[in-house]
Amino acid sequence: MRKTIYLLLFFFFLITSCSEEKTDFILKGQISGLSSDTLLVYYQVPEFKLDTIFCQEGKFEYSIRPDTITMFSLIFSSEESLPVFADKGQTVEIKGSTTDFEIQGKGENKLMNEIFSLLKATPEKNIRQVVDSLIQTNYQSFTNLYLLDKYYVNQEHPDYNHLKKLIESQSGIIKDTPYMMLLQPKTEDLANENSSPRVVN
């Protein structure tokens, strides 16, 4: 009888612990050089939306409960932003300044930190070549949304033909994001327009 009670208690605690599986994503940060005590949060995956984070002397903590992998960017200025990838039960820490930071995390966040470190060590003249290689090598990674936007879309004179080829090299899961579903047809139209022969009168 006593063994039966112990077994029942064991299974009860086992079920309880499983049901209490962590589902929140937590972002902790300490960023110097912020121009305001409020950070704008721009969500890109799985949907577009905005939020804000309140900071105290550059420190903040932000938590969400994602149903699936979620990508959002912390907007530091019109030129500087930091992409963050939220998944169930994970914690990510960010330390540094608005222009030089370190991301401590797993998966896509770890990859993004490695990419930032690589680009920081790359001479300016070789940046585009390295970014090209990263985008095509990591064709299933959400980090490419950041790279495509920063180094190709937000340029004074975008190369739409090259951008089109890079987009085509991405996996279905990346192409199906809201950002890419808007970008791809627009890029194809502009690439075709630039490739069309011009009639000279």
Model-identified regions with their sequence ranges:
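A non-transmembrane, solvent-exposed segment enriched in polar/low-complexity residues
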Residues: C18-N138, F142
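N-terminal "domain-start" segment that seeds a small globular fold
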Residues: L183-N201
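Short coil/turn linking the two alpha-helices of tandem helical-hairpin repeats
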Residues: Y152-H157
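Sec-dependent bacterial lipoprotein signal peptides
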Residues: M1-T16
